């Protein structure tokens, strides 16, 4: 425990505080102006508050660690010795509550769900976007959710810009599935089109369409999230006193303890998180999200959630029905105990609003700018001053009663930049900005005029500014990728350059001791010092992600995407084994059964084979000029089947353990693009699905279609990734348009079936899933289409990939 407290001492040096507080000369100096003396007292109070909050954080961490110990002991007592990873590593806190459901304010007799468990059913918010008066609703937890509008609400169009697609089901009643006991098939309908699926002979007599499928006894628990959203978000990286680095991707906020290699996850949001702020108490966190659309077409309004980073309890939800499109900037006030929160939305007017977040009341709002707003922050010593910056503007706002009054920053002799990209504050209350011209400008406290300028501090725009605890200013450049530190007189101290592979600096945060944390536009989180190297602690893809392949015998998987990267991941160490840049955007991948090579298909018709140990290129081929959606090796490793968007399946003979390829031919017969492929256990047959819901069977060695039902109905399939088939048709929801489900995978033990859909959900079914409307456990986390899912080699974990959210999520099967 002493080690735990020693880690906190590195965050704050209390000896300097005591020395400062005992020094009466500051207040006794006759030359000091009254305003400076007041500012000095404010600093003293703030430093004392920081120490108090530090002690609170330390105590909270002690409680967290004690609960981890209790949790581990309880598991050991219940299950006995086990080789499995300790429960405490994925359930760090026993008292944590259900990841985002708002808790009732009154005591409840029922116990909340554990924090680590994912929210399995999302209850969409149904409050209207357009409101004309104050309103409130009772949440499922029994807590009243105030609209936060005590003065009437702005009318909103409720436009949505979410990446999650919401498809309304057809108003006409869909046709029910039909069972033919004479022919032994089930017929279902997608968009009114019949899909006929023949069942094995031995199931015809016992099958009933009215039978009810059972929920699986196993469940999923989110264990790890790969990736970080730096490409289009700012100020979203912080170090908490508990030693956790907090950031977000998709709809999940990640709390990552790098030293202990543990992640916790706040999962209260139902769509993309776009902004994050940490309260002065260093425990309370606010996160804002975009608008979304639910599966049934209902709008999910943008809002801000305030939550406890120790327990993961949601404390307050504000702005439902007020914000438009997305919440892009948020910040807590500093000098009044963090009682206020400011937010900027993504409406055409980019409205700035100020909230008493504990009362969930809006104090004031005003049109901020017609142009993009990049940052909004409270002045550190004056609660009533807010600074916003963005395209062609820098504004100083004063909160007076229920109004916000604006003063524009005057550039005067200084050339006005096209973008003011970031803002921070000095110890004496000056405002400091970084702009697209590479200049650092200092604005005197209480004024809107420039008092000092550092011309050409960077080559190109300054994307981030961070004021360290010791008064050192750190600036991060975009174009030049440089990290530069400056003293109190704005003289350059140190300079470091981030390697080109990591991309431009997006945000800078202070870590432990002299460690600096950096988020980049290529979705890396780096840590290092100004005098040393920076190494990645988190990385992910930067463009749409579709390809996923699982190693046959190791806890490894490969992902590839439109960013032209193919990455092999270690699922145990949660880090990349290697990353390979390829020449074309990638779409699909597949491991050879030996695991020695992996094939990657692209959007251009080219496909590559790489050595999994060295990542060296083994061979490259081209088949057509359209997207290759599926790469699937036969179980015996002697064939490779490639499904293309030109409606054909290309078959290659494979020898030399996956290193030599000879084209056998192509299977033609589909009238639409190939979506999924599976091989039979004996490698003699192939089944395929297409974009127009066809199910066709093939003898791949001869590239001939098999039309005999008696031949195909009893084939045993080595894998089940086809979304259409008798054993999986129960995964389709009623009224589906046939494109809702992007991926299906069967566990190796053949008792579980998982799907990824267009609504950001991962579903876990029992296998076989051959009853209509089969029940499932539902898991949220992705904010875009779930493009692929697959179980690791021993079925211990499931991997899911997001499309536009570029995230990879690793779920533990429990």
From Swiss-Prot:
It holds the Pfam family Beta-prop_EML. Residues 175-814 are annotated as: Tandem atypical propeller in EMLs. It comes from the Eukaryota. GO terms for biological process: brain development; hematopoietic progenitor cell differentiation; microtubule cytoskeleton organization; mitotic spindle organization; neuroblast proliferation. Its main location: cytoplasm. InterPro entries: Beta-prop_EML-like_2nd, Beta-prop_EML_1st, HELP, Quinoprotein_ADH-like_sf, WD40/YVTN_repeat-like_dom_sf, WD40_rpt, WD_repeat_EMAP. GO terms for molecular function: microtubule binding; tubulin binding. Residues 92-101, 127-137 have a biased composition (Polar residues). WD repeats lie at residues 260-309, 314-357, 362-399, 408-445, 449-488, 492-529, 534-571, 577-612, 616-654, 663-700, 708-767, 774-813. Residues 31-72 form a coiled coil. Residues 77-180 are annotated as: Disordered. Detected in adult brain cortex, hippocampus and thalamus. Expressed in the stomach, lungs and in Sertoli cells of the testis. Keywords: Coiled coil, Cytoplasm, Cytoskeleton, Disease variant, Microtubule, Repeat, WD repeat. Residues 142-152 have a biased composition (Basic and acidic residues). Homotrimer; self-association is mediated by the N-terminal coiled coil. Does not interact with EML3. Binds unpolymerized tubulins via its WD repeat region. Binds repolymerizing microtubules. Interacts with TASOR. Modulates the assembly and organization of the microtubule cytoskeleton, and probably plays a role in regulating the orientation of the mitotic spindle and the orientation of the plane of cell division. Required for normal proliferation of neuronal progenitor cells in the developing brain and for normal brain development. Does not affect neuron migration per se. This is Echinoderm microtubule-associated protein-like 1. It comes from Mus musculus (Mouse). The gene is Eml1.
């Amino acid at each position: 425990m002493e080690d735990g407290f020693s880690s906190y001492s590195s965050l704050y040096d209390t000896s300097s505080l005591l020395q400062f507080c005992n020094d009466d000369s500051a207040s006794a100096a006759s030359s000091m102006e009254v305003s400076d003396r007041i500012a000095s007292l404010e600093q003293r109070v703030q430093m004392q508050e920081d120490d108090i909050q530090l002690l609170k954080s330390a105590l909270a961490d002690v409680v967290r660690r004690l609960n981890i110990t209790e949790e581990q002991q309880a598991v050991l007592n219940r299950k006995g010795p086990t080789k499995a990873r300790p429960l405490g590593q994925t359930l760090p806190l026993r008292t944590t509550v259900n990841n985002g459901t708002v808790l009732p304010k009154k005591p409840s007799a029922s116990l909340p769900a554990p924090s680590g468990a994912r929210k399995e059913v999302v209850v969409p918010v149904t409050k209207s976007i357009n409101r004309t008066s104050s309103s409130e609703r009772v949440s499922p937890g029994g807590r009243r959710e105030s609209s936060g509008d005590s003065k009437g609400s702005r009318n909103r169009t409720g436009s949505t810009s979410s990446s999650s697609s919401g498809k309304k089901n057809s108003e006409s009643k869909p046709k029910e599935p039909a069972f033919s006991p004479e022919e032994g098939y089930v017929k279902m309908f997608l968009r009114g089109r019949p899909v006929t699926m023949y069942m094995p002979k031995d199931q015809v007599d016992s099958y009933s369409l009215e039978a009810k499928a059972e929920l699986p006894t196993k469940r999923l628990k989110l264990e790890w999230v790969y990736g970080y959203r730096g490409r289009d978000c700012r100020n979203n990286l912080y170090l908490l006193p508990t030693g956790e680095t907090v950031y977000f991707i998709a709809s999940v906020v990640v709390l990552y303890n790098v030293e202990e290699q543990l992640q916790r996850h706040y999962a209260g949001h139902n769509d993309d998180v776009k902004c994050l702020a940490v309260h002065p108490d260093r425990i309370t966190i606010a996160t804002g999200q975009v608008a979304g659309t639910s599966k049934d077409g209902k709008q999910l309004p943008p809002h801000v959630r305030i939550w406890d980073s120790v327990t993961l309890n949601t404390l307050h939800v504000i702005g439902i029905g007020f914000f438009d499109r997305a919440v892009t900037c948020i910040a807590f006030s500093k000098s009044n105990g963090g009682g206020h929160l400011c937010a900027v939305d993504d409406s055409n007017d980019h409205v700035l609003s100020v909230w008493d977040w504990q009362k969930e009341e809006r104090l004031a709002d005003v049109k901020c700018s017609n142009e993009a707003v990049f940052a909004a922050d409270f002045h550190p010593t004056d609660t009533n001053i807010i600074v916003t910056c963005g395209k062609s503007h820098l504004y100083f706002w004063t909160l007076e009663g229920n109004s916000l009054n604006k003063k524009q920053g005057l550039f005067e002799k200084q050339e006005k930049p096209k973008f003011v990209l970031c803002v921070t504050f000095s110890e004496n209350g000056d405002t400091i900005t970084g702009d697209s011209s590479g200049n650092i400008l200092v604005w005197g406290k209480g004024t809107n005029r420039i008092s000092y300028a550092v011309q050409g501090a960077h080559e190109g725009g300054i994307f981030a500014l961070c004021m360290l605890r010791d008064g050192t200013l750190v600036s991060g450049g975009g174009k030049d990728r440089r990290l530069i530190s400056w003293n109190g007189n704005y003289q350059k101290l140190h300079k470091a350059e981030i390697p080109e592979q990591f991309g431009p600096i997006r945000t800078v945060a202070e870590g432990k001791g002299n460690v600096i944390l950096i988020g980049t536009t290529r979705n890396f989180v780096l840590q290092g010092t100004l005098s040393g190297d920076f190494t990645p602690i988190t990385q992910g893809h930067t463009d749409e992600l579709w390809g996923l392949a699982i190693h046959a015998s190791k806890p490894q998987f490969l992902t590839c995407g439109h960013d032209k990267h193919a990455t092999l991941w270690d699922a145990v160490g949660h880090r990349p084994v290697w990353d390979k840049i390829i020449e074309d955007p990638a779409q699909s991948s597949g491991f050879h059964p030996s695991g020695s090579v992996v094939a990657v298909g692209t959007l251009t018709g080219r496909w590559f084979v790489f050595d999994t140990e060295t990542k060296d290129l083994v061979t490259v081929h081209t088949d057509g000029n359209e997207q290759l959606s599926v790469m699937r090796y036969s179980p015996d490793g002697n064939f490779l089947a490639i499904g293309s968007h030109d409606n054909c399946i290309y078959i290659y003979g494979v020898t030399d353990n996956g290193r030599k390829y000879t084209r056998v031919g192509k299977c033609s017969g589909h009238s639409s693009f190939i979506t999924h492929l599976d091989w039979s256990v004996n490698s003699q047959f192939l089944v395929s699905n297409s974009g127009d819901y066809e199910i066709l069977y093939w003898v791949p060695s001869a590239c001939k279609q098999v039309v005999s039902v008696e031949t195909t109905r009893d084939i045993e399939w080595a894998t089940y990734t086809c979304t259409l088939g008798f054993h999986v048709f129960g995964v389709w929801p009623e009224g589906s348009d046939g494109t809702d489900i992007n991926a299906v995978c069967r566990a190796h033990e053949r008792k579980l079936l998982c799907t990824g859909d267009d609504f950001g959900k991962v579903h876990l079914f029992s296998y076989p899933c051959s009853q209509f409307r089969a029940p499932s456990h539902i898991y949220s986390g992705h904010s875009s289409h779930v493009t692929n899912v697959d179980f690791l080699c021993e079925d211990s974990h499931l991997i899911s990939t997001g499309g536009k959210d570029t995230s990879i999520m690793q779920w533990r099967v429990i």
